Design a protein with these regions (language model features):
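Structural beta-alpha unit
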Residues: 1-9, 23, 84-118, 154-161
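Small/aliphatic-rich secondary-structure junction motif
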Residues: 3-63
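General small-molecule cofactor/ligand-binding pocket signal
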Residues: 43-45, 94-98, 148
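Short secondary-structure boundary segments
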Residues: 46, 121-123, 151-152
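Short, hinge-like loop/turn segments at secondary-structure boundaries
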Residues: 59-63, 112-114, 136-138
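A short acidic, glycine-rich active-site loop
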Residues: 62-78
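Glycine-rich, Arg-bearing micro-motifs that act as flexible, cationic patches
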Residues: 117-141, 156-159
Length: 161
């Protein structure tokens, strides 16, 4: 994919992955700016951990109780509600909650609808993220549409496309 900038594209439908992080809010702010400029609609996507699939993972090995799906879903719904409040009323916005691993769910959601771009924040996992693979890296390498990743670096905000 070419090195496109968000400002260079005419956008109608944006998929914005939100997780409550500062970098996620930066991605949402960039989406709002683009939506106002292009009269575009925004879909906010939050991916909740699927408790049934994660129950056999690290938490079980560590002896922790399995995660409560209702709590996980409620946290994702709250993240979506907080994100909706950041979108001006003149922008059409809808919420989408999915369960699973964030990277594959974001890519799947994008493939299931006619979005022009995906915007998401980088969590800044550093070397560990590089070893295990970050959500933003997964989305950038697997999505069929442009992906824009916002970064929050030590209190300094920047956005990369």
């Amino acid at each position: 994919m070419s090195e496109e900038r968000l400002e260079e594209l005419h956008l109608r439908r944006l998929l914005v992955a939100v997780d409550g992080s500062e970098s996620g809010r930066l991605a949402l702010r960039a989406a709002v700016t683009a939506a106002l400029r292009d009269n575009a609609a925004i879909t906010l996507l939050c991916v909740a951990v699927d408790a049934a699939k994660s129950a056999g993972g690290f938490a079980a090995v560590a002896g922790a109780p399995p995660p409560d799906q209702a709590r996980l879903d409620a946290a994702a719904e709250e993240t979506l509600a907080e994100s909706v409040r950041l979108v001006p009323t003149e922008i059409p916005v809808r919420k989408l909650l999915r369960r699973g691993h964030a990277g594959p769910e974001i890519v799947a959601a994008a493939a299931e609808s006619d979005y022009d771009a995906i915007l998401l924040g980088a969590r800044g996992l550093g070397r560990i993220g590089a070893l295990i693979g970050s959500v933003s890296s997964y989305v950038m390498h697997n999505a069929e549409i442009p992906v824009f990743v916002a970064h929050a670096v030590r209190g300094v905000e920047k956005s990369a496309g």
